[in-house]
Amino acid sequence: MVKGRQGERVRLYVRGTILGYKRSKSNQYPNTSLVQIEGVNTQEEVNWYKGKRMAYIYKAKTKKNGSHYRCIWGKVTRPHGNSGVVRAKFTSNLPPKSMGSRVRVFMYPSNI
């Protein structure tokens, strides 16, 4: 018999929002995405997240490996501007439907 969970649930990631692709006035560069991490508002705070892994999790119609959920992994590469936005590169370019959706920014690999 399994006992109920004791205490509060612990989240091992920070939520982020996908803002869009890196772009100039007339071109966009879909191999780099812009992500706003919750609670990060300055360029100095972004430095802790450099190199951290992130995952865009989405639901698909057909099952693969017994699950409808799939994941695109990425990595925080550098800050973008002064307001806490980061640039991230993903293993494959994010689909356009991902704009405005959530991403999980994990606390590893640690660089302490």
UniProtKB/Swiss-Prot annotation:
Keywords: Ribonucleoprotein, Ribosomal protein. The keyword Ribosomal protein applies. GO terms for molecular function: mRNA binding; structural constituent of ribosome. InterPro entries: Ribosomal_eL33 (IPR001780), Ribosomal_eL33_CS (IPR018266), Ribosomal_eL33_sf (IPR038661), Transl_B-barrel_sf (IPR009000). Gene3D superfamilies: translation elongation factor selb, chain A, domain 4. One of its GO terms (biological process) is translation. Pfam families: Ribosomal_L35Ae. GO terms for cellular component: cytosolic large ribosomal subunit; mitochondrion. Belongs to the eukaryotic ribosomal protein eL33 family. This is Large ribosomal subunit protein eL33y.
